[in-house]
Amino acid sequence: MNETGAAAAAADTAATAFVLRLGDDALVAGHRLAETEGSGLWPAPARGTAHDSGPEAARIARGLLRLAGSLLGYAGRMEEQLTGVMRTEDDLVRGRDADQFRNLRLVEPTDSDLAHTVVRQLLFSAYALELYTALTASTDATLAGIARAAVRELPFHRDHAVRWALRLGAGDDDRRRLGAALEEVWPCTGELFLSDEVARTAAESGFGVDPARLRPAWEAEVDGALRDARLSRPGPVPVAPAAACGRAGVHTEDFARTLAGLRRERAPG
């Protein structure tokens, strides 16, 4: 293979890996949020309010799982072009070991507390909206189309999280819970902007986007929401270790249980 062919193959491999990691993000985030439906985590709506967050969270979860289906399905077709073997969405969900998933660690922890759910959704949805907005300009028509569909839904995801951050921030006890949750998950935020070889190669070809360029807008969005909730971020966005993060297949202790639960839900029959 000549130099030009090798570069093209590297770009195609990176593009496939880029789509797969985004599919994994949406899959795990959607599953985690779906688990909260009927769990009692979301308080009943107050009399006279227009929002019932249980069904709204379920709507967001379904949207993320649809996005995951589109991305994983596309990743499988891209793999077929590279290897001659196509894996379906279900193959990619059920046929990979935990260390072959490339999702962000941010979306993995169990939702045992509403404050943790709200913080995670705020941080992730603000990132996802910036990411998919940028991807609408992808040189790949399929990815750009998936991104355009996502951008129609993601503002609702972000606004739902912001609204709940404001609601929890209004009470002293709930604001303390929100602050504790923020302290706990903040170390995972560096991975959102990790510019590894996959991201850089996908961005250089015009297929993807370098996550590092999303950081200023994300910080402005998150800082504004936290300020309105009478909170502040714990510190600067940390630098993620490229070899010890979800993008490298290194996951939290919760992930094996998450994956087992996700597969049970998708079991035939």
Set out the residue ranges of the language-model regions.
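Hydrophobic packing residues in well-ordered alpha-helices of helical domains and bundles
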Residues: V19-L22, A26, A57, V118, ...
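A structural signal for well-ordered alpha-helices, especially hydrophobic packing surfaces
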Residues: G30, E37, A68, L72-A75, ...
